[in-house]
Curated annotation (Swiss-Prot):
The active site is at 11. Na(+) binds at residues 166, 169, 172. Allosterically activated by HslU binding. Its main location: cytoplasm. InterPro entries: ATP-dep_Prtase_HsIV_su, Ntn_hydrolases_N, Proteasome_sua/b, Proteasome_suB-type. GO terms for biological process: proteolysis involved in protein catabolic process. This is ATP-dependent protease subunit HslV. Belongs to the peptidase T1B family. HslV subfamily. GO terms for molecular function: metal ion binding; threonine-type endopeptidase activity. Keywords: Allosteric enzyme, Cytoplasm, Hydrolase, Metal-binding, Protease, Sodium, Threonine protease. It is an enzyme of class 3 (hydrolase). The lineage of its organism: Bacteria, Pseudomonadati, Chlorobiota, Chlorobiia, Chlorobiales.
Length: 181
C-alpha cells in the first residue's frame, strides 16, 4: 500500500443575488487531513475592475491558476461573463494540464451568479445562489431559507448562511470575508 496523499478541505464559498445587489463570501479555514493549518485564508477576490467577485474551493495553487486564466478570459472577452466562463470551462475540460486541476470557482456580478467546474460545467442557478466547497450544502440551505422567509440583504444572507455552515461543517470556520457589488 502506498501512502495516501492528504486531502485538502479548505472552504465554503457562498454568493447571493438580491434586489440588484450581489454578495460573495467565504470562511477562512484551511485544513490538511484532520489538521487546521490556517484560520484566515482569503478565498475571494474582485476581478475586472471590480465588476465581478469570485471565490474558489479546492487546492489553492490549482484555484489560483484558474483564477488567473479566468481573469485573462474576462479581459479577452471584454468583461462578458458568460462567454469568459464558457471559454474557461472548455479550456479546463480539454487542456491536458488544466483538467488535472482540482478546484471550483463561484462568480457573481450585480445580476448573475455562476459556478464553473472542472468537468466543463457552467451552472447558473435559477435562484441566484451559488455555493461551493465542503460546507456548501449547509450554506446553500440556509441561504435559500433566508431568501424565502426574510428581507435580509444579499450581504446579510451570505454572512448568516456562512455562520450556519461554520456551526455544522468541521471544515468551515467563522472567519468570514465578504465582498459586495
Amino acid at each position: 500500500m502506498g501512502q495516501q496523499k492528504p486531502q485538502i478541505r479548505s472552504t465554503t464559498v457562498l454568493g447571493v443575488l438580491r434586489d440588484g445587489k450581489a454578495a460573495l463570501g467565504s470562511d477562512g479555514q484551511m485544513t490538511l487531513g484532520n489538521t487546521v493549518m490556517k484560520h484566515s485564508t482569503r478565498k475571494i477576490r474582485s476581478l475586472y475592475q471590480g465588476k465581478f467577485v469570485t471565490g474558489f474551493a479546492g487546492a489553492t495553487a490549482d484555484a489560483l491558476t484558474l483564477l488567473e486564466r479566468f481573469e485573462a478570459k474576462l479581459e479577452a472577452y471584454s468583461g462578458r461573463l458568460d462567454r469568459a466562463a464558457v471559454e474557461l470551462a472548455k479550456d479546463w475540460r480539454t487542456d491536458k494540464y488544466l483538467r488535472r486541476l482540482e478546484a471550483m470557482l463561484a462568480v457573481v456580478s450585480s445580476d448573475k451568479a455562476l459556478i464553473i467546474s472542472g468537468t466543463g460545467d457552467v451552472i447558473e442557478p435559477e435562484d441566484g445562489i451559488v455555493a461551493i466547497g465542503s460546507g456548501s450544502m449547509y450554506a446553500l440551505a440556509a441561504a435559500r431559507a433566508l431568501m424565502k422567509h426574510t428581507t435580509l440583504s444579499a450581504e446579510e444572507i451570505v454572512r448568516e448562511s456562512l455562520q450556519t455552515a461554520a456551526e455544522i461543517c468541521i471544515y468551515t470556520n467563522d472567519h468570514i470575508a465578504i465582498e459586495t457589488l
